[in-house]
């Protein structure tokens, strides 16, 4: 939940109201325009380096695109597809306030960005004219960052949450590949302030990889742990289309292949690379 102290520090943007839905049921362009205007407003208020906000705006655009690709490949019915697309559009709405107020994207050092995103959706009435999909959208947004989904979710929430979690991870892989495989220095916020220290490794992250399980952010101790964790996401993809794109994009393969071939990561590295290849 978002406490009163954080709530009192949130901005109060004056943004063009959303029109009533019209046209194709999977056309959410009005929501995309609202989101872009909101992001620009938050950027104008930011007294820190605003470039991480730009990364999040681009991330949102690509997650929404990935979600659309999955809904089409998996033949998700149009009403459910709209819920998935809106959840993708707004899943990181809280990231802008999170960064502006706390200077980090690390939830444990600031605020749960998924809860903040859902809070802002309701605060700004973004689903007032979308009542038939509101439960699925809000549920998926709140749950998109949890380690494991609860078992007893309503079916609409479960479908939207699973799909958005896949789409989110697919684009996070792109971001991490661009930052860690590039020639420049990677911003510390992108790697959740983990040290780039080759001598540090997490046996818990390695163990998850060897067991074919998704590793937890809570167990990270270094950038190399982060690389391996990203590779373990192959074990948590929920849709065939997601798994194929995970392998086909090449981002995860590059990230994991950059781990040392010898030493503590060797066996886990080989296991994850094999799993990625088999998904392609």
Stretch-by-stretch model annotation:
Residues 2-9:
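Short, low-complexity S/T/E/D/G/P-rich linear segments that nucleate or cap local secondary structure
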Residues 53, 103-111, 124-127, 131:
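Short gly/ser-rich anion-binding loops that grip negatively charged ligand groups
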Residues 62-70, 111-125:
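An active-site-proximal "capping" alpha-helix that borders the catalytic cofactor pocket
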Residues 36-62, 96-107:
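Active-site flanking loop/helix segments enriched in acidic
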Residues 75-86, 126-143, 156-163:
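Acidic/histidine metal-binding catalytic segments
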Residues 10, 15-29, 52-61, 65, ...:
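Divalent metal-dependent phosphate-bond-processing catalytic cores, especially two-metal-ion Mg2+/Mn2+ enzymes
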Residues 81-106, 117, 136-147:
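His-Asp-centered metal-binding catalytic motifs of divalent-metal-dependent phosphohydrolases/nucleases
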Residues 32-39, 64, 118, 122, ...:
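An amphipathic alpha-helix signature
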